[in-house]
C-alpha cells in the first residue's frame, strides 16, 4: 500500500544543514518570509516561529495557524514552517520539502535530520535577500513515491 503524502514542509538551513544554535535560529531574512507568503495561503507554525510571521514589517495575506508541534497538527495539503523540530518522524507525510539555504556557515547544534540525497530535487531558485547576498530555494519531492 502506498503511503499518502499530505503536507509541504518549509525549512531554512545553512551550508552544514544547521537550523538552530543554542535554541536560537541561525538567521532570518524578510525576503524569505515574503517568498513563503507567495507559495502558501495558510501556514502552520510553532510559537517559536510566530514572531517571524506576525510582524508589522512583514505584510502578507497568510492565514497563520500557531500550534505547539505544528507539524503534527497541519492539515492535509497545508504548508508547515519548521525550525525546531525533527522531521524524520514525519517524512512519510511530507509531499514537498521546501528548503531555503542561507549559503553561509553558522554555528549550529540542531541540524536537519533528513538526507536530502534521498529526495528528488525538482526546482532551484536563487534570489537576493534583505540581509543575505544570495538565498537559494530548493524544492524536493520524495524519490520513493514518484510524486
What function would you assign to each model-found segment?
Residues 1-147:
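Enzymes that bind and transform nitrogen-containing heteroaromatic metabolites
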